[in-house]
């Protein structure tokens, strides 16, 4: 299907994973705007992850310092994702076409980013997925931080989570259809 328009937006200069883009795709007489997003990660270091997985209190000062470092990264991530979610939502609202939003939200389903971006849209996992839907292979066995949201005018036909470790995220796919005219 031909792409008739494209746009890439970076939120923060020199920030490798803080970006989104969209393309307008023509299918027969319909045009769909597809967003691909990668919201701010927590940017945990190996030391952070090691401490999260197995907190130690042998040295109280070191433990306190590591805990404060982790909390600061959570705060920074939440605040940046709030700004990003608001910007993406504004672009969704401006779209003259039905929208699909897919990507790495780096946030869970009860988060501000999830609800802001997914407002008045259907989540493909919720519609057709099953189980916990874990998409992140690290830290926790239950983190679903990757999403596919579709316009309510579209039907989600199926959702698939691929349990292959190709990166630190498991791939997700959905088949969607425009309603018959």
Task: State where each predicted segment sits.
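Structured beta-strand-rich core segments of catalytic domains in phosphoester-bond hydrolases
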Residues: 1-49, 148, 160-163
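Soluble or luminal CAZymes and related metallo-dependent hydrolases
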Residues: 15-17, 76-87
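Phosphate-binding glycine-rich loops and adjacent basic patches that engage nucleotide phosphates
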Residues: 44-55, 75-79, 108-113
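A solvent-exposed, charged loop/short amphipathic helix patch at secondary-structure junctions
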Residues: 49-73
